[in-house]
Amino acid sequence: MKILWLSSWFGDYRVPVYDNLNRLSDGAFWIVCSEMETSELVRRKLREKLGDHAIIMPQQKIIRLGNADSDFANSSLALHWQQGLYSAIRNVKPDVIIVEGFGRWAPAGIIYSILHRKRLLMFYERTAWTERKAGWWRTLYRRLAGKAVDCFLSNGAFSEQYLRENLGFSSAPIIRGCMSADSFYLHYDVEAELEARHKADREAECRNGKGIRFLYVGRIVEPKGIRQLLEAWEIHHRSYPDDTLTLAGEGILLNEMRERYGDDKGIIMAGYVSYDRIYSYYKDCDVVVQPTLEDNWSLVIPEAMSCGRAVMCSIYNGGYPELVKDSVNGYSFDPLDKEGFVNAFAKFHSANLLKMGRQGMMIEKNFSPEKAALRIYKACCPVV
């Protein structure tokens, strides 16, 4: 059984899933991706794991319509044309095709599956909240194109709810838990650096006047809730002046936020941090905060959990129902409710951070690359 996954863009976190799918299929897994939309680091890792089964397509043409400057979902329309894509699919002669959502390269996979009567799986991440501005024509297209899909692979409850209630696939097979973070390697890197240091020292630091170390990892842009984060932090810091907040990431708001906040009020603007070094930031924090205003399934939360860190997660992150259990491994909050946001920061001062971290590690294990790959592989198997 040959499995072919079409995905023009993805990050490092996907490579372990692809590697596990390749093992489960006894080497009968292929991935087609874009050279223009993936990093050199990702392409190198793919070649190491998959060899010539990693098909990397050269430059593609992208036409953007609408407000291309906005980072919010559905603010613009991007049309992707990749020369040779259909030929690449045809050369593999797959028994199963996996596409990413309805856009980008998905139409090529959908057409091939219909013409050649092959099993079609669709990896779908969006939620009703992220798609609240999708428009009638996007919704109509998705309802029509989705009729060709044999099984949907979703992040969790919110994605399944959107597929069933908003797009009308009420009886379609939908497999949850198909997203994962690169948890194994992050956990390994953090543990390697902490080996010579007793873990209990972290809690002692929080109780000896050094405060709690909060961390944000991600782009410094409007949809990530950066303005709301720093406004709430200003208020929180007046009551807890020993706490610190580190922002690891870059984006269009970075310079503006640096000018406004600098490094005062316990705020540290770290700027860009490579994926291969992000583990050191997880190692040196106590709580990871994700204040997003819209996100399908933020990978930062399971990454933090795999490293044994408590989490503070926005209710607009599509993954929070599965990943965040209030008072168990962290707290959820509404970033648009400033008072609630500030209160969420304060809750960690009466929490057992080490216990929360351990609970988070247990929850995250259900979303490991191995388990995600196994769920996906089982969805492929009905063709046998």
Could you say what each language-model-derived stretch is?
Residues Y316-S327, Y331-S332:
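Short acidic/histidine- and often glycine-rich active-site loop of Leloir-type glycosyltransferases
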Residues K118-W136, A148-C151:
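A short, histidine- and acid-enriched strand-loop-helix "catalytic/donor-clamping" loop
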Residues L293:
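Aromatic "clamp/platform" in nucleotide-sugar-dependent glycosyltransferases that forms part
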Residues A310-S314:
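Short hydrophobic beta-strand element within catalytic cores of glycosyltransferases
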Residues E205-K224, L230-W233:
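Conserved donor-binding/catalytic core segment of Leloir-type glycosyltransferases
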Residues N255-V273:
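Nucleotide-activated donor-binding/catalytic signature segment of Leloir-type glycosyltransferases, i.e.
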Residues K147-R202, G209:
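Donor nucleotide-sugar binding/catalytic pocket of nucleotide-sugar-dependent glycosyltransferases
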Residues Y272-V273, S280-C285:
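Short alpha-helical donor nucleotide-sugar binding micro-motif in glycosyltransferases
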